Structure formats: structure tokens, C-alpha cells
Amino acid sequence: MSVTVKRIIDNTVIVPKLPANEDPVEYPADYFRKSKEIPLYINTTKSLSDLRGYVYQGLKSGNVSIIHVNSYLYGALKDIRGKLDKDWSSFGINIGKAGDTIGIFDLVSLKALDGVLPDGVSDASRTSADDKWLPLYLLGLYRVGRTQMPEYRKKLMDGLTNQCKMINEQFEPLVPEGRDIFDVWGNDSNYTKIVAAVDMFFHMFKKHECASFRYGTIVSRFKDCAALATFGHLCKITGMSTEDVTTWILNREVADEMVQMMLPGQEIDKADSYMPYLIDFGLSSKSPYSSVKNPAFHFWGQLTALLLRSTRARNARQPDDIEYTSLTTAGLLYAYAVGSSADLAQQFCVGDNKYTPDDSTGGLTTNAPPQGRDVVEWLGWFEDQNRKPTPDMMQYAKRAVMSLQGLREKTIGKYAKSEFDK
């Protein structure tokens, strides 16, 4: 229901609105309500031998066609099979029954790609032995192409080279250092669907002899789901259950985003679901789980984790245009509560030698913070502090960030350092 605002001087009524300049999020379950297949368009008119040469020579010359890449990957990977030891289904689609032998492309629906196939340069010296490492190389370039940081890019490329050399000792990189022809491959929906299908298949068959192909595809899993990853990281760093962590959400914006992420029926907690690949399979163009669509949750969660000494949180991206003050206070209070209490309890005993706490003694002294992690107790205490961080809270935060060095701009680490280490 719209809220009206009245001008005092003349009682003019207005309804304040902002322009709708953002696309709404799209959920994977909604995709499958409209369609029961994921189409993959491949040109299958050329032989695997021809395609192998086209791709090899195209990579070396810097003029490879993504259509050739996709067609080659399909031809080289279509006979890889795995036997299911349980039924496999997702969003109402039956992928296979226990005992079935299935392939990578059973996860999608193959369609013929219309149009003229681009010309390619043949190479008769290429053999089927290349099919053991060339798909790994092509899929690995997807991961390399997703980062623009030179140092990390080189590290990934070196790792890819080592993976290929484990299969073929004579392997030499086909793409010269500094050439970025493969960076745009991620814009091709058929290529990303192959990447997603490969990763989803080998996630199910982790012990498959070709599972090393996941070196490049693993970043497809939970792509654009950074806020969801933040939630998982926060649960681990605090040692608290998902339910208990949720009770510590103290800001309306964070609560709204939590509701958005936890929409039922999306198979978030189903490991063999299509859901982790919602972006690369084309199930969603705007992920409900990204840091872009959940900036307040992402900031609050990563700041809390950082104040609990998480090394991973220091490089998390700092969102723009959020209500920093309240979110910072909420993150500080949560981290202080966890950091100043130890969730310790005897887990095993010999005979009946068990510790029994005496609940009749103790109790809070004036201004003393609670001893546990109950959000209700902490909020009551915080009210007594006039809802402002205490000097001890600020000192706790300073100790957490004072040793941080080499922080990148626009990161949570950089923000926390400037906020608390004054």
C-alpha cells in the first residue's frame, strides 16, 4: 500500500516514488515453471577430427571461433558417462534413475545451431590423444577469463598449464601470455551452458577419471551468489546455526534481502540441483543471491566476519549507496557478542563425570555485557548503553583491524580499517 505525504502549507497530497531503474531478480524455479528443458545449440555438421584442428590452430593464431569451440567440446565430451548410484532429479526434471548410465549432455536439451559454420584451418597432425587435455584447456580458459587481476590471472594460467601437463608432459600453452581472445567466451550462452553442464556432471561424479576438467568450470557453481556465500561463511566463522545467525539480523534492509534470498522452493540446500548454475544455464539473468542485489546483507555479514578475524572477508567488495552507519553498528555488536563469549560445553564424559552449571549464581553487574550469544540479552544490554558502541566495543574492533596491511580500495577490509583504526 502506498504511503501518502501531505504538504503542510496547503495540504497537497503526494505519493513519493523513485524510478524503477533496476531489473527484478529471477528465481530458478520460475524458469522451470515455464520450461522443462535447457536448450543447447550446437553445430554438429563437422567431424571431431576437423573441429580438433580448427580449435588448435585457431587458438595458436588468435582467431578461434566460439562456434568451433562449442562444437569441439560437444564432440569430445559427449561420450563421457557415469553410472548413478541414486535417483537424480531437480526442479521436477528426472535426470536419471539409480543404475542409469548418463552423460554430460543429458543435463541439457541439444538443438541444431542454424547458420553457416565459420571456416577453419585443418591440422592433420592432431589426434584423438589431444581430446584428453584440449577440453580441459578450453574449459580452463573460462576461469582465467573471468578475472582481470594480472597476478591472479597468471596464477590461474600457470595452474591450468600444470593440469594439462599432468595429462600430456609435452603440453605447451596455445594462447600466448597477454592474449585475451578467450575473455569474451563467457558472453556466449552455449559455451557457458557447456561449462555448467560439465561442472554439474563432475560434481555428481567426483571420482570420475575426467573430473580434473572441473579446474576451469568450478567457478560456474554458485556464480553471482556472493551474498549466499556470505551467509554460509558467517555461519562458519561464528560457529552458529543458520537459525541463530538469522536472529542477529537487526536492520530492515538486511531482513528484506534475507527474505529475498530465502524464498522457498529454490533448492538452495540441494547439492545436485540446477540451482547453483542458475546464471550459466540461463535460468536467471538477475541472481537473487548476488552481492549486487543484496548489498546490505553482504556488507553486514562480511564486516561481522572481518571483525571476527576472517582473512577471507578483508577483500570482499564494499557495496555503494547503503546505510553504512546502522549496518556498521549492527555488525560490530554481533562480532563483539561472539568475540567476547565462548560457546563452550562439555561434549563427552567418562561414566557420570559431567559438569553441571549452577544457574543460581552469577548474573549481570551494572553495564556488564551478557556472557552468552542470545540476541535478546545483547539488545537489552545495548539499549542500556543508549544504543551506542561502548569504548570496549570500539577497542575490540580496533584490535581486529589494526594489523591489516596492503588493503585494496573499495573493500570491506579497507572500510573497516579506516572506520575503527583511527
UniProtKB/Swiss-Prot annotation:
Gene3D superfamilies with a match to the protein in the record: Nucleoprotein, Rhabdovirus nucleocapsid protein like domain
Key words of the record: Capsid protein, Helical capsid protein, Host cytoplasm, Ribonucleoprotein, RNA-binding, Viral nucleoprotein, Viral RNA replication, Virion
Residues bound to RNA: R143, Y152, K206, R214, K286, R317, R408
InterPro entries reported for this sequence: Rhabdo_ncapsid, Rhabdovirus_ncapsid_C, Rhabdovirus_ncapsid_N, Rhabdovirus_nucleoprotein-like
Disulfide links within the chain: none
Record localization: Virion; Host cytoplasm
Sample GO molecular function, one term: RNA binding
Pfam families: Rhabdo_ncap
GO biological process, one term: RNA replication
Segments of this protein annotated with the region Interaction with the phosphoprotein: 350-390
Keyword ATP-binding appears in the UniProt entry: no
GO cellular component, one term: helical viral capsid
Function: Encapsidates the genome in a ratio of one N per nine ribonucleotides, protecting it from nucleases. The encapsidated genomic RNA is termed the NC and serves as template for transcription and replication. The nucleocapsid is bullet-shaped with the tip containing 8 turns of a conical spiral before reaching the helical cylindrical trunk. Nucleocapsid assembly is concomitant with replication, therefore viral replication depends on the intracellular concentration of free N, termed N(0). All replicative products are resistant to nucleases.
Membership in a protein family: Belongs to the vesiculovirus nucleocapsid protein family.
Complex and partners: Homomultimerizes to form the nucleocapsid. Binds to viral genomic RNA; this interaction contributes to the virion assembly. N in the nucleocapsid interacts (via C-terminus) with the P protein (via C-terminus); this interaction allows to package the L polymerase in the virion and positions the polymerase on the template, since P acts as a bridge between N and L. N(0) interacts with the P protein; this interaction prevents the uncontrolled aggregation of N(0). Interacts with the matrix protein (inner layer); this interaction contributes to the virion assembly. Interacts with the L polymerase.
Annotated protein name in UniProt: Nucleoprotein
